[in-house]
Each structure stands twice: as structure tokens, then as C-alpha cells.
């Protein structure tokens, strides 16, 4: 899994941050207020109402759970919530909170109505999660003083606070934890027009010249994800400054992204390698994932966790009981004629393949 995570971070079209340097770059481009936040209109409108209501009552905002694919702005929203509420934000992540004392130290240092942001909240340990329940409901925590027979439990009162939890895997949250969030919001992938607005805004902050067509060209290849759009913008800006006059046009963006092996739908070399293997080595499928992994020289986990999700979400790949199958979109993308088998229909005699 470590190798899979490393590989995901190395891809230019990966939705996870590649380095601490990139995280610092993201912070510089991050919108600071809700009215600067592009996209996610439904979530933004809801938060605007809930935040204003909490401010009028001088209360802490209800606890917020943000979930959705990586790179869509969950961390950005957590910072915006704190800024709109006019309070401090403390940030941590699930894997960092190893012991109950780690969480207790954070909670006891919060001031009234502060925001505690826990990224990857689905990775909290059960021990830490147990401490969190009374803190969320009653603004109290139980801590143990002493050891052995002399140990005793002491209740500590906390200041009212808002927990903002972020996760890419909402299904891994326990029911008791999920039920304690009063505001639950799912972030969706962005369309090309929304991403184009984000690219133009980021270009202005970077003092980069870009025209609307150039911004749209980058947006269309960003896989619906602002983090990828901003990363591609940086690379296209470099290309424009060295190979062109510094102005990012559609032609300049196309040439730069072609150099980076990012095609018109946002596929990179690894995406195309997987799809071409299914088309040419396995006649469009079905093919079991272990055979596919051997054919392209990648690990099974890499295929399932890194490569497949976007291809399936975009309709280029199907998972069937018998294996992976290329769709009509895949044949069209590679300029091939699709056989009838490219639009499979399951019948009663289909049986699951053990390696699927």
C-alpha cells in the first residue's frame, strides 16, 4: 500500500498532494471566504445559512462532516468555516492522533467556538474515537488519572467547539461517529466551466497571462479536480514562459499537456497503458485483475486503488463478475471500431471469476 500511495502521488494527474512544497502552493491559492469559493453551490449555500445562524446566536457551528474524492476542497472549506465564524482553527489528521491523550490535549486548548479540523477522520483509532463521543455531544471528556487500582476517571469540561471532519471514505466511518455530525456534505467533481474559473483565478494570483480558451483546455484535462487543475496550470505556465511568449493560449496549453502525456480527457500514460492492454491483449475483456496486473507490470492494489476509479467513474471501464471490460467510449477514444462484445450484457450463465 505504501508503494501504491507513492505511485499515486508521483502522477501529475494524481488528486493527492505530491509534496509539502505543493501543499504550500495550494495554501497560497486557497480562497479565503465563501463568496470566493468556486463550485459546490449546494454545499456553499447550506454552509452560508448555517454559519450566519450560528453567528447570530453566538453559538458554535454544529459539527460538520465533509466527504468526497481527494482534491475537491475539503481542507479549504474547513479553513473558510473558521474564517467566516471569526474563530481559530486547529488542524490535525486521524493517523496522527494515536493516543487518547493526543486528542485530549487538542480539545482542552480550544477556545470558545473554535474549529477543530481532523483530516482522514476515518482513520481514527477506536480508543481516540471513544474519547471524542462525549466531547462532541456534551463538551466533556473523561480522562484517567493514575494507574492500576488507584486510577480514577475525571470529567473535564470543554469550551463549545466545532469539529470539521474530512474523509474520502465515508463508508469506513463508524455509525456512532457519523451520527454525531449535524451537517453532512458531499463534495462532487467539478465541471469544465467551474474548473476554468478556478484556473483563471489561480493564474491571476500567480501573475500568469492566460486567455479563456487556454484556461478551458487545462480545465478539460483536470479530471474534475481543482488540485489537478492548479498543478497542471503551474506546468503549463513554465512551458509558456520557456517555449512561448508567456501567454497561455489553447494551443500553448495543448502543446504543454501533450508534452506531459496528459491527453484531452485527462488520461496519462498509465491510464492508456491499462486500457490498451484490455483492448489489444485481451480483446476488450473480460479480464481478471490479476491477469491485467501481470500484463501491464503493476500491482493489483495499484490498479484497484489508483487507476480504475477514474476510468470507471468516466465510463471507460466496467467491472463485471467475469472481469474488467472496455466500454464503447474506450474504443472511440482510441479510434477503434467496437465489436458487439464491447457492450456486454450479463446473462444467467455468467459466473464470477475467482481473480476478479
Curated annotation (Swiss-Prot):
Its EC number is 3.6.4.-. Residues 191-261 are annotated as: Small ATPAse domain (RuvB-S). It catalyses: ATP + H2O = ADP + phosphate + H(+). Mg(2+) binds at residue 75. GO terms for biological process: DNA recombination; DNA repair. InterPro entries: AAA+_ATPase, AAA_lid_4, DNA_helicase_Holl-junc_RuvB, P-loop_NTPase, RuvB-like_N, RuvB_C, WH-like_DNA-bd_sf, WH_DNA-bd_sf. Residues 4-190 are annotated as: Large ATPase domain (RuvB-L). Homohexamer. Forms an RuvA(8)-RuvB(12)-Holliday junction (HJ) complex. HJ DNA is sandwiched between 2 RuvA tetramers; dsDNA enters through RuvA and exits via RuvB. An RuvB hexamer assembles on each DNA strand where it exits the tetramer. Each RuvB hexamer is contacted by two RuvA subunits (via domain III) on 2 adjacent RuvB subunits; this complex drives branch migration. In the full resolvosome a probable DNA-RuvA(4)-RuvB(12)-RuvC(2) complex forms which resolves the HJ. Belongs to the RuvB family. This is Holliday junction branch migration complex subunit RuvB. It comes from Burkholderia mallei (strain ATCC 23344). The lineage of its organism: Bacteria, Pseudomonadati, Pseudomonadota, Betaproteobacteria, Burkholderiales. The gene is ruvB.
Amino acid at each position: 500500500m505504501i508503494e501504491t500511495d507513492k505511485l499515486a502521488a508521483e502522477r501529475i494527474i494524481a488528486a493527492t498532494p505530491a509534496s509539502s512544497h505543493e501543499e504550500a502552493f495550494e495554501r497560497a491559492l486557497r480562497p479565503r471566504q465563501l463568496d470566493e469559493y468556486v463550485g459546490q453551490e449546494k454545499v456553499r449555500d447550506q454552509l452560508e445559512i448555517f454559519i450566519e445562524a450560528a453567528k447570530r446566536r453566538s453559538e458554535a457551528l454544529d459539527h460538520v462532516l465533509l466527504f468526497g474524492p481527494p482534491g475537491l476542497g475539503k481542507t479549504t472549506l474547513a479553513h473558510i468555516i473558521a474564517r467566516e465564524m471569526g474563530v481559530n482553527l486547529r488542524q490535525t489528521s486521524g493517523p496522527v492522533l494515536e493516543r487518547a491523550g493526543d486528542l485530549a490535549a487538542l480539545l482542552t486548548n480550544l477556545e470558545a467556538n473554535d474549529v477543530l479540523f481532523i483530516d482522514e477522520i476515518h482513520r481514527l483509532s477506536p480508543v481516540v474515537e471513544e474519547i471524542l463521543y462525549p466531547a462532541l455531544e456534551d463538551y466533556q471528556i473523561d480522562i484517567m488519572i493514575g494507574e492500576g487500582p488507584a486510577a480514577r476517571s475525571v470529567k473535564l469540561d470543554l469550551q463549545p467547539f466545532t469539529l470539521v471532519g474530512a474523509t474520502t471514505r465515508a463508508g469506513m466511518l463508524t455509525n456512532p461517529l457519523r451520527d454525531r455530525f449535524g451537517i453532512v456534505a458531499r463534495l462532487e467533481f467539478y465541471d469544465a466551466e467551474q474548473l476554468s474559473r478556478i484556473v483563471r483565478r489561480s493564474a491571476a494570483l500567480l501573475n500568469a497571462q492566460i486567455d479563456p480558451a487556454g484556461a478551458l483546455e487545462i480545465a478539460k484535462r483536470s479530471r474534475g479536480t481543482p488540485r489537478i487543475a492548479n498543478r497542471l496550470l503551474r506546468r503549463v505556465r513554465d512551458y509558456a514562459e520557456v517555449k512561448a511568449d508567456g501567454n497561455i493560449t489553447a494551443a500553448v496549453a495543448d502543446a504543454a499537456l501533450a508534452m506531459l502525456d496528459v491527453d484531452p480527457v485527462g488520461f496519462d500514460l498509465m491510464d492508456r497503458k491499462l486500457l490498451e492492454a484490455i483492448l489489444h491483449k485481451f480483446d476488450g475483456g473480460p479480464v481478471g485483475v490479476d491477469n491485467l496486473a501481470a500484463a501491464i507490470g503493476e500491482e493489483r492494489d495499484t490498479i484497484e486503488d489508483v487507476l480504475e476509479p477514474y476510468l470507471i467513474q468516466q465510463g471507460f471501464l466496467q467491472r463485471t463478475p467475469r472481469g474488467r471490460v472496455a466500454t464503447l467510449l474506450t474504443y472511440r477514444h482510441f479510434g477503434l471500431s467496437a465489436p458487439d462484445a464491447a457492450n456486454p450484457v450479463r446473462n444467467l450463465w455468467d459466473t464470477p471469476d475467482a481473480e476478479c
